[in-house]
């Protein structure tokens, strides 16, 4: 069952997102201990794990999340999400159609990326629990990212559909969260702000402060 508070501090990570001196397990556990509210396993890039290696890692990270009662979401990979019985899946505009995914994930969390008004207009949100809007700011984590849309896009979507849960993504750090919250976002999703933080506990707690009012 989806709760929009899951979106508050939403951590996204894969093996290519962590510094060389740390493992993804260490980074995720530190983030979980600090209080992230949702985790998305996003294994992308030239060095991304595939096949059984990816499956094994996904199961290990899922187990970690469940020890802390944090939902485990898979990015894009429908077959992996089904195989490990993930808590949900997040897809982009070019990935599998949401309607088809909903057949397999009737009681799971489904998230959809939307970058602009055109994508919003052509998206079927019937089975979608939340949308990921961005990139809000320029981001180094996604080489194929769209032009930054700014917090204003969140405000626009909230005006169009006040009940739709929205998580912001793209270039977010502890210094630029305030305009996102003011625009009406239910949470922020970050990659490098947490994965490359020198003090993950401090970073996560600063993010949490924006949503604990």
From Swiss-Prot:
Residues that hold 2-[(2R,5Z)-2-carboxy-4-methylthiazol-5(2H)-ylidene]ethyl phosphate according to the record: 139-141, 171, 191-192
Catalysed reactions listed for this entry: 2-[(2R,5Z)-2-carboxy-4-methylthiazol-5(2H)-ylidene]ethyl phosphate + 4-amino-2-methyl-5-(diphosphooxymethyl)pyrimidine + 2 H(+) = thiamine phosphate + CO2 + diphosphate; 2-(2-carboxy-4-methylthiazol-5-yl)ethyl phosphate + 4-amino-2-methyl-5-(diphosphooxymethyl)pyrimidine + 2 H(+) = thiamine phosphate + CO2 + diphosphate; 4-methyl-5-(2-phosphooxyethyl)-thiazole + 4-amino-2-methyl-5-(diphosphooxymethyl)pyrimidine + H(+) = thiamine phosphate + diphosphate
GO terms for MF: magnesium ion binding; thiamine-phosphate diphosphorylase activity
EC primary class: transferase
Binding-site positions, Mg(2+): 76, 95
Residues that coordinate or bind 4-amino-2-methyl-5-(diphosphooxymethyl)pyrimidine: 40-44, 75, 113, 142
Cofactors: Mg(2+)
Cofactor binding notes: Binds 1 Mg(2+) ion per subunit.
Pathway note: Cofactor biosynthesis; thiamine diphosphate biosynthesis; thiamine phosphate from 4-amino-2-methyl-5-diphosphomethylpyrimidine and 4-methyl-5-(2-phosphoethyl)-thiazole: step 1/1
Gene3D superfamilies membership: Aldolase class I
EC number(s) stated in the UniProt entry for this protein: 2.5.1.3
Record has Magnesium as a keyword: yes
Keywords: Magnesium, Metal-binding, Thiamine biosynthesis, Transferase
The keyword Signal is annotated on this UniProt entry: no
Chain's role: Condenses 4-methyl-5-(beta-hydroxyethyl)thiazole monophosphate (THZ-P) and 2-methyl-4-amino-5-hydroxymethyl pyrimidine pyrophosphate (HMP-PP) to form thiamine monophosphate (TMP).
Family of the protein in this entry: Belongs to the thiamine-phosphate synthase family.
Name of protein: Thiamine-phosphate synthase
Encoding gene per record: thiE
């Amino acid at each position: 069952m989806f709760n929009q508070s899951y979106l508050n501090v939403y951590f996204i990570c894969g093996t290519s997102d962590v510094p060389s001196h740390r493992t993804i397990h260490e980074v995720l556990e530190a983030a979980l201990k600090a209080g992230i509210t949702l985790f998305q396993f996003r294994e992308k890039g030239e060095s991304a794990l595939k096949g059984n290696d990816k499956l094994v890692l996904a199961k290990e990270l899922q187990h970690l999340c469940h020890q802390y009662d944090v939902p485990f979401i898979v990015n894009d990979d429908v077959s992996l999400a089904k195989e490990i019985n993930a808590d949900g899946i997040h897809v982009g505009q070019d990935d599998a159609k949401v309607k088809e995914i909903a057949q397999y994930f009737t009681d799971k969390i489904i998230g959809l990326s939307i970058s602009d008004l055109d994508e919003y207009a052509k998206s079927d949100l019937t089975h979608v629990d939340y949308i990921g809007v961005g990139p809000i700011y320029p981001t180094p984590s996604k080489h194929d990212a769209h032009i930054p849309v700014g917090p204003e896009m969140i405000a626009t979507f909230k005006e169009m559909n006040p009940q739709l849960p929205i998580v912001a993504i793209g270039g977010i750090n502890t210094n630029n969260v305030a305009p996102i919250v003011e625009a009406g976002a239910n949470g922020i999703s970050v990659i490098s702000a947490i994965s490359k933080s020198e003090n993950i506990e401090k970073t996560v707690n600063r993010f949490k402060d924006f949503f604990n009012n």
